[in-house]
């Protein structure tokens, strides 16, 4: 794929030749990035189906590459916005830990995102077969993969145990999906031998929600841990000193300060080129920039307005990652699905100006709430945010989940026009001419300029007469209130580019542990239809209906923008552009491929 350089010092991820050309143009002494021991995904080969089963899409297996004899040494230092305490048990772990763990990676999944697309390729599974009706998946577990800390070889028993942990989690964002598909009441699971796991979901499911659990790096992955460690040492030890399978294993950690990761020598897939990696928790952008400029950090999660600071460092370069994230603006308290029942969520409150006391979309109460929601959206100048805070590294977007290739599916009228005068008029029509109070909180998850862009939204709302209480708090503080459905404000929330919109739909259902604060009977019905549609045409038709309904009702999945990401590369490391996994690109990934200069 071809990309124009917005900045001559930026390396656009693409072919190795383009990468090297860009590096040399910047005067870097970096050379081609080789891989080390194990398995790499650039040159896939087909995995045949067995028993006459036909798969909707072919699966592939990675190929072996030569082993390097170089001895590991040195430390790779990385600056993160937020880590929290190290956690690794699939039942007890939430985000940001899920995402940080598999971006490193400490943890691995059955599949992995490719280097040149976000299609899922086999990793801990050598491949999988899918029945023609999409109901039975047979996973062929990779042989010879050892767990960290001496807990033996991974088998299908560990895989089923790990998925069961995810399915019974109160923190994992796709726990309800894992339970519905892998542990359905009408389904079954069979371990036919130590390396074969057969899952019958009871009813057919689209591959989209399944692949989201299989793929890394993502904040929604189902990773594999040692059942033996859990049984032998207990849940707490398995949670804080997790035996997983990644190229890095957890060593020492201190909450609020650092995670120290040790390289796994002779790793089955890719041995790191550094003996250690330390992930430092540094919430302030200015402190991360200072650490990079003084040479204490080799790379860090960076706001786009820090690009000039990075460029001032002798020998430093930048890697541009196109279409890395999409951001949405969510209004909480719209949990209509169980409103008025004993199971009503605490956040539901029809006194909130954007929440209707009647879930009937044809009711006057609903129409009034729509006016308020529309007023909030068209008060925001999305293009100005892209031009100023994202420095042009992105574009406006209408619906979250459709960001990227699926934007081509929007109907002509589906866009949010910046019109503050109309915003004020709509508020007056709804009975809020003098505005109202609202809490706005950025979900701090490592996306470019996520706090600054949310602050801009607060200012736009202030301009139309709202009294905005802006909360800048750690995501580990915010997220439990979203899970419990107690939060009643708005959030700016960045997520990954989806393989399909359906991938993000579970968080708008009543059964999901994580919630974007918007649940409705119509969405429950249509999301189920999309997620169980085996045929692509049927799934897309359901997605389009969902998108249109959310746009017309200004209800949920409201987009702000799609942004590229830019990762700083310090003078002591080489760029690794050909080894970035095209999964969730909010977090830096590919650390196991980074080489010293």
What is the role of each PLM region?
Residues 3-4, 12, 18-69, 112-116, ...:
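Extracytoplasmic/periplasmic ligand-capture domains
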Residues 91-101, 154, 159, 213-216:
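Short Gly/aromatic-enriched secondary-structure transition segments
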Residues 83, 144-145, 204-205:
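Acidic glycine-/aspartate-rich tracts in secreted/extracellular proteins
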Residues 77-132, 164, 241-245:
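N-terminal lobe/hinge region of extracytoplasmic solute-binding protein
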Residues 175-229, 571:
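Surface-exposed binding/hinge segments that line
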Residues 569-597:
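Long beta-strand-rich cores associated with HINT superfamily self-processing modules
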Residues 391-413, 565-572:
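Mature extracytoplasmic/periplasmic domains
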């Amino acid at each position: 794929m071809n990309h124009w350089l917005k900045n001559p010092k930026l390396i656009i991820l693409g072919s190795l030749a383009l990468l090297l050309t860009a590096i040399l143009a910047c005067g870097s002494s970096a050379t081609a990035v080789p891989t080390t021991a194990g398995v790499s995904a650039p040159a896939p080969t087909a995995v045949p189906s067995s028993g006459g089963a036909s798969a909707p899409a072919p699966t592939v297996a990675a190929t072996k590459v030569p082993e390097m004899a170089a001895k590991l040494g040195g430390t790779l230092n990385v600056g993160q916005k937020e880590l929290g305490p190290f956690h690794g048990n699939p039942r007890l772990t939430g985000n940001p830990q899920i995402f940080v763990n598999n971006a490193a990676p400490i943890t691995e999944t059955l599949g992995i995102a490719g280097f040149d697309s976000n299609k899922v390729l086999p990793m801990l599974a050598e491949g999988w077969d899918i029945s023609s009706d999409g109901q039975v998946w047979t996973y062929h577990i990779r042989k010879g993969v050892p767990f960290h800390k001496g807990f033996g070889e991974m088998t299908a028993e560990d895989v089923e145990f790990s998925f069961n942990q995810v399915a019974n989690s109160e923190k994992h964002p796709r726990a309800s999906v894992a339970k519905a598909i892998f542990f359905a009441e009408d389904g079954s699971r069979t371990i036919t031998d130590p390396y074969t796991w057969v899952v019958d979901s009871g009813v057919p499911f689209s591959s989209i929600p399944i692949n989201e659990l299989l793929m890394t790096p993502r904040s929604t992955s189902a990773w594999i841990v040692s059942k033996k460690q859990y049984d032998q040492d207990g849940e707490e030890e398995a949670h804080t000193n997790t035996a997983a399978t990644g190229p890095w294993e957890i060593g020492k950690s201190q909450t609020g300060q650092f995670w120290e990761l040790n390289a796994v020598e002779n790793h089955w897939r890719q041995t790191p080129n550094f003996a250690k990696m330390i992930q430092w928790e540094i919430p302030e952008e200015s402190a991360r920039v200072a650490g990079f400029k003084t040479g204490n950090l080799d790379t860090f999660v960076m706001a786009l307005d820090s690009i000039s600071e990075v460029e001032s460092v002798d020998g430093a370069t930048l890697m541009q990652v196109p279409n890395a994230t999409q951001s949405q603006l969510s209004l909480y308290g719209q949990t209509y699905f169980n409103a008025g029942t004993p199971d009503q969520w605490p956040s539901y409150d029809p006194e909130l100006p954007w929440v209707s006391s009647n879930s009937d979309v044809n009711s006057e109460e609903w129409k009034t709430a729509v006016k308020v929601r529309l007023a909030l959206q068209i008060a925001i100048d999305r293009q100005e945010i892209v031009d100023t805070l994202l420095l042009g590294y992105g574009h406006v977007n209408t619906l979250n989940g459709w960001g990227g290739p699926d934007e081509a599916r929007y109907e002509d009228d589906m866009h949010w026009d910046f019109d503050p005068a109309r915003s004020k008029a709509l508020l007056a029509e709804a009975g809020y001419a003098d505005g109202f109070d609202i809490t706005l909180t950025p979900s701090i998850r490592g996306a470019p300029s996520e706090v600054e862009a949310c602050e801009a939204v607060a200012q736009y709302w202030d301009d139309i007469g709202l009294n905005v209480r802006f909360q800048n708090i750690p995501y580990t503080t915010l997220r439990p209130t979203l899970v419990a459905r107690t939060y009643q404000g708005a959030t700016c929330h960045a997520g990954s580019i989806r393989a399909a919109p359906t991938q993000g739909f579970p968080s708008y259902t009543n059964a999901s542990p994580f919630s974007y604060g918007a649940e409705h009977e119509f969405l429950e019905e249509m999301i189920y239809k999309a997620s169980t549609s085996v045929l692509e045409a049927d799934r897309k038709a359901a997605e389009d209906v969902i998108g249109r309904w959310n746009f017309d009702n200004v209800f949920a999945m409201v987009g702000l923008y799609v942004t590229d990401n830019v990762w700083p590369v310090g003078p002591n490391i080489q760029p690794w552009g050909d080894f970035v996994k095209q999964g969730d690109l909010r977090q830096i990934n590919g650390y196991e491929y980074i080489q010293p200069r």
